[in-house]
């Protein structure tokens, strides 16, 4: 039951962070492009790479810490459902170029940020 609590706690923190970060970033840029979701997903991609390389592979942290940080915190911080809906909305609104930039950018940059996080975690 302790692992479930760790996931729930991390998820609550990650979801609150996602809400706040998305809102701040979206308001800062003030554009219709879904930059808030892109930002939190890229931050999450970076940290999942970092956490796996450093905490899991190097430090071998216990399952509760992994559940709290990776499944909970990063699972709550990142959002596939919002990404999917925003992508669909761009298509529905006829914003084909924005749709392509958003979907390709999220996927390509997400993998790249995961790679960067992993490399940083390995180097520590």
From Swiss-Prot:
InterPro entries: FluC. This is Fluoride-specific ion channel FluC. Pfam families: CRCB. It is a multi-pass membrane protein. GO terms for molecular function: fluoride channel activity; fluoride transmembrane transporter activity; metal ion binding. It comes from Aquifex aeolicus (strain VF5). GO terms for cellular component: plasma membrane. HAMAP family: FluC (MF_00454). The keyword Ion transport applies. The gene is fluC. It catalyses: fluoride(in) = fluoride(out). Keywords: Cell inner membrane, Cell membrane, Ion channel, Ion transport, Membrane, Metal-binding, Sodium, Transmembrane, Transmembrane helix, Transport. NCBIfam families: crcB. The chain crosses the membrane at residues 1-21, 35-55, 68-88, 99-119. Na(+) binds at residues 75, 78. Belongs to the fluoride channel Fluc/FEX (TC 1.A.43) family. Fluoride-specific ion channel. Important for reducing fluoride concentration in the cell, thus reducing its toxicity. Na(+) is not transported, but it plays an essential structural role and its presence is essential for fluoride channel function.
